[in-house]
Curated annotation (Swiss-Prot):
Acetate binds at residues 49, 145. It holds the Pfam family Polysacc_deac_1. It comes from Colletotrichum lindemuthianum. The active site is at residues 49, 206. Keywords: Carbohydrate metabolism, Cell wall biogenesis/degradation, Chitin degradation, Chitin-binding, Cobalt, Disulfide bond, Glycoprotein, Hydrolase, Metal-binding, Polysaccharide degradation, Secreted, Signal, Virulence. Its EC number is 3.5.1.41. Monomer. Optimum pH is 8. Optimum pH is 8.5. Optimum pH is 11-12. Residues 1-26 form the signal peptide. This is Chitin deacetylase. The gene is CDA. It is an enzyme of class 3 (hydrolase).
Length: 248
């Protein structure tokens, strides 16, 4: 189940309607309401789900080489355990490099299949892990499978979460082979409008897929820059100052 685009329009309207606010410091990002796009045109938020994983450090290198900040929606224990091996160092590096770290739940369940108590537990477990790793807890999240009904949205809103959807899915998980990754790059190019003054995008990819890291990401960056877009974190995309990206 995909979030309704109606929620995206409502969230954008709520963000845009903030009065007497500076572009960054005072804009209020809605909680408990799925958000599909940025609050001003010309911005692209590259987002990566399911990590950290083997390929994530290389992705961080590529982003740094291109002077690009991105957003990582991390799991606690999915492809890898967030607190095992070098993963804590990877999380700390994400933040040190200026990226936004959000939650993708602890174990990647479909939140619509869980009770309220279990949904809350999934989110709290990630918060506890990230506090142990680097002393922070996310305020941004993306639901696994983009699946979050009204009850789920209510629970996440009660926890103070900004729910991030997407309006451009690269489908990289379908094209994780050297001979097919170009299909995701072409999809991105085709769906990224040339009308920079009227469009913005929250782009969905996954740092657990090798071709996304070694091939696709550079193509995404080159394409968005060639069309005149600027790559930003989801927080900047929504006019949210960095000091507001995490819970106290």
């Amino acid at each position: 189940m995909h979030f309704s685009t109606l929620f995206g329009a409502a969230a954008t309207a709520a963000l845009a309607g903030s009065t007497n606010a500076s572009p960054l410091a005072r804009r209020q990002v809605p909680v408990g309401t799925p958000i599909l796009q940025c609050t001003q045109p010309g911005l692209v938020a590259l987002t990566y789900d399911d990590g950290p994983f083997t390929f994530t450090p290389q992705l961080l290198d590529i982003l740094k080489q291109n002077d690009v900040r991105a957003t990582f929606f991390v799991n606690g224990n999915n492809w890898a355990n967030i607190e095992a091996g070098s993963n804590p160092d990877t999380i700390r590096r994400m933040r040190a490099d200026g990226h936004l770290v959000g939650s993708h739940t602890y174990a990647h369940p479909d939140l619509n299949t869980l009770s309220s108590a279990d949904r809350i537990s999934q989110m709290r477990h990630v918060e506890e892990a990230t506090r142990r790793i680097d002393g922070f807890a996310p305020k941004y999240m993306r639901a696994p499978y983009l699946s979050c009904d009204a009850g789920c949205q209510g629970d996440l809103g009660g926890l103070g979460y900004h729910i991030i959807d997407t309006n451009l899915d690269t489908k990289d998980y379908e094209n994780n082979k050297p001979e097919t990754t170009h299909l995701s790059a072409e999809k991105f190019n085709n769906e990224l409008s040339a009308d920079v003054g009227a469009n913005s995008y929250i782009v969905l990819s996954h740092d657990v897929h090798e071709q996304t890291v070694v091939s696709l990401t550079q193509k995404l960056i080159d394409t968005l820059k060639s069309k005149g877009y600027r790559a930003v974190t989801v927080g900047e995309c929504l006019g949210d100052a960095p000091e507001n990206w995490y819970k106290a």
